[in-house]
């Protein structure tokens, strides 16, 4: 559960920090994905693509670290 303190009735700042926390925890993405039924076959393909993207990103980060 996400907690956001509201100091001195500053609701605008609290809303901004809530949005940032929700984006970091991928709440918006999970809400979007659960809007419609996703068949298991499509879910497997999506998860595999996400995994490949994550691994590609990690490899690129390692290469950059080795070059420096």
Swiss-Prot record:
The protein's name: Small ribosomal subunit protein bS21
Pfam families: Ribosomal_S21 (PF01165)
GO cellular component: ribonucleoprotein complex; ribosome
Native source organism of the sequence: Orientia tsutsugamushi (strain Boryong) (Rickettsia tsutsugamushi)
UniProt family annotation: Belongs to the bacterial ribosomal protein bS21 family.
Keyword terms: Ribonucleoprotein, Ribosomal protein
Molecular function GO labels: structural constituent of ribosome
Keyword Ribosomal protein: yes
